[in-house]
Regions:
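Structured soluble/peripheral alpha/beta segments that form catalytic or ligand/cofactor-binding pockets
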Residues: 1-201
Length: 201
């Protein structure tokens, strides 16, 4: 991973339970290079086309948590562009982890809601979603392509994850008021539920 942008998102999130917190940095729009081998076929990753996010954190968590996260990194009209969105993990009433990244600069967003459709009283991950922000600066439709679901349940310890990949179409507004139009922008949308003893990650 190379070409770290000038700015990235860092947040210290408290929990209601005393002594519990999460300190997290997410660096979007890193240039990625390397290769992936699938079966007998090898795919080369070149930094002119491929991007990644580095998600780094340390903290002491509460036992049972469910959170929503969306991460995107890529090119928009030739410029590095992406975002980090999330909520549900800790107390984000004072500050959120929602931000756009455009040409190496961070553009902070207010609260963002992930509207996941329901079917038979359950979340329907493969139907179109809607994303809205309280400041009106992130309004998107999300069209899922793949739900990588996995559940490991040892009763006391549990990890139930939906990692949904798909494409976003809509509008994001930068700090200077510039409206950025997005069409079929590829992104990931994980929704994990975890039960674990207090730990660091």
């Amino acid at each position: 991973l190379t070409d770290e942008p000038d700015e990235s998102l860092v947040i210290a999130t408290p929990f209601e339970k005393p002594g519990h917190f999460y300190y997290n940095q997410k660096i979007n729009c890193l240039r990625a290079s390397g290769w992936v081998k699938l079966g007998g076929e090898k795919f080369e990753l070149t930094p002119d086309r491929f991007f990644a996010v580095l998600d780094w954190g340390r903290g002491v968590w509460t036992y049972h948590n469910t959170w929503y996260w969306s991460s995107a990194s890529g090119l928009l009209d030739g410029a590095p562009f992406g975002w980090n969105l999330g909520y549900g993990f800790g107390d984000t009433s004072a500050a959120t982890e929602n931000a756009l990244i455009y040409n190496g600069r961070l553009h902070k967003l207010d609260h963002v809601t992930f509207e996941i459709p329901m079917k038979d009283r359950k979340e329907d991950y493969l139907s179109p979603w809607r994303f809205t922000s309280s400041d009106g600066r992130f309004e998107m439709q999300f069209r899922p392509v793949l739900d990588r679901a996995a559940c490991t349940d040892f009763k006391l310890l549990k990890s139930d994850q939906h990692q949904v990949f798909g494409r976003f179409t809509g509008t994001a507004v930068l700090d200077d008021g510039t409206a950025v139009r997005v069409k079929d922008f590829l992104a990931a949308m994980p929704k994990p539920e975890k039960k674990s003893t207090s730990s660091t990650e």
